């Protein structure tokens, strides 16, 4: 890797860490006065249209044509990963502190590794130890009565909403497991475009069922609009574009570090911006989760590289 590429990779990693680590703050600002599900739906409408136009101009409109199987698979993955994963997050961040939410989501590589056992892809001893420790860390974070809900959450059960975030995270992990086994577009940006479109439709329907109002979205505060625009531009467009570039130009072990760097960014911002309190169980459980994820990501990435070299 040349020095110029190394510099670009380092800058891109920094952008990805900031873009995705700060999305939790963006969501928190957005849902202050915007309906959670509709705001996420319209976020993906805007982002998918922008990506569609960008890809069409850069690579030609023919590159956006999909087979029926590719179209169905991309939309299904969008509903499962973005719709369920970020839809539940938008609902839950009304109650669950941002730092706690990010630490629960950080465990995604652990769930993905567990799903792969269904495909007779047995984890190594190191992975198994990391997975076990990660599950213990999640359990410590989610101990009932140990996490203080956000001030404006009313009397809602914070533990219940942590489990809802966990459900969304499991859906995202299941999608990550299924994606390589499905017929999807080869261009990751094209795949992201159709995933966002599928998620937008599902979240809009869910928002209507949840009796959310489009007028509430339009009449939101300046801060909520700022958060929403940030999610569209930085979280979706810049984040995904940088991520796909890194996948093509950097080792997967390096790219995968976002899984345990992002929650550190989110926890720090939660303390600075929202004065969130880190209890002992959050500190201990969070530390265990981040270390466990680092182990699992490193081991699984090394296994993938050795398999690709063997082939």
Q: Where are the regions that the model predicts?
A:
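Transmembrane alpha-helices of multi-pass small-molecule transport proteins
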Residues: 31-84, 109-115, 170-178, 192-212, ...
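Specific transmembrane alpha-helical segments of multi-pass solute transporters/efflux pumps
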Residues: 19, 23-24, 52-105, 140, ...
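Hydrophobic transmembrane alpha-helices of multi-pass small-molecule transport proteins
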Residues: 51, 107, 123-148, 260, ...
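Helix-capping/transition residues at the boundaries of transmembrane alpha-helices
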Residues: 31-32, 93, 120, 183, ...
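Membrane-interface interhelical linkers
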Residues: 1-15, 49-77, 120-129, 146-160, ...
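Hydrophobic residues within alpha-helical transmembrane segments
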Residues: 11, 15, 41-46, 72, ...
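Structural signature of hydrophobic alpha-helical transmembrane segments
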Residues: 35-49, 91-108, 158-170, 223-233
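Helix-helix packing/entry segments at the starts of transmembrane helices
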Residues: 40-42, 82, 86, 100-107, ...
């Amino acid at each position: 890797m040349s020095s110029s590429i190394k510099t670009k990779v380092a800058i891109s990693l920094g952008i990805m860490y900031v873009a995705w680590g700060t999305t939790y703050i963006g969501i928190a600002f957005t849902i202050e006065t915007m309906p959670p599900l509709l705001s996420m739906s319209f976020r993906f409408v805007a982002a998918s249209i922008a990506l569609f136009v960008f890809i069409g101009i850069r690579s030609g409109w023919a590159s956006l044509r999909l087979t029926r199987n590719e179209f169905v698979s991309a939309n299904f993955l969008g509903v499962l990963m973005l719709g369920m994963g970020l839809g539940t997050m938008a609902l839950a961040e009304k109650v669950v502190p941002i730092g706690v939410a990010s630490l629960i989501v950080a465990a995604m590589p652990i769930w993905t590794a567990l799903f792969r056992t269904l495909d007779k892809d047995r984890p190594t001893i190191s992975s198994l130890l990391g997975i076990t420790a990660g599950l213990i860390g999640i359990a410590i974070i989610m101990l009932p009565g140990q996490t203080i809900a956000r001030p404006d959450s009313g009397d809602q059960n914070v533990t219940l909403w942590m489990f809802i975030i966990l459900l969304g995270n499991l859906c995202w992990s299941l999608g990550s497991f299924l994606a390589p086994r499905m017929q999807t577009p080869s261009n990751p940006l094209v795949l992201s475009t159709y995933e966002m479109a599928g998620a937008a439709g599902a979240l809009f329907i869910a928002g209507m069922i949840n009796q959310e109002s489009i007028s509430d979205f339009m009449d939101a505060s300046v801060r909520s609009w700022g958060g929403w625009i940030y999610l569209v531009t930085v979280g979706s467009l810049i984040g995904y574009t940088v991520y796909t570039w890194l996948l093509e130009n950097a080792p997967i072990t390096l790219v995968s570090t976002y899984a345990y760097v992002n929650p550190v960014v989110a926890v720090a911002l939660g303390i600075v911006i929202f004065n969130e309190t880190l209890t002992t169980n959050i500190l201990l459980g969070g530390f265990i989760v981040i270390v466990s994820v680092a182990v699992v990501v490193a081991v699984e990435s090394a296994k993938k590289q050795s398999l690709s070299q063997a082939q």
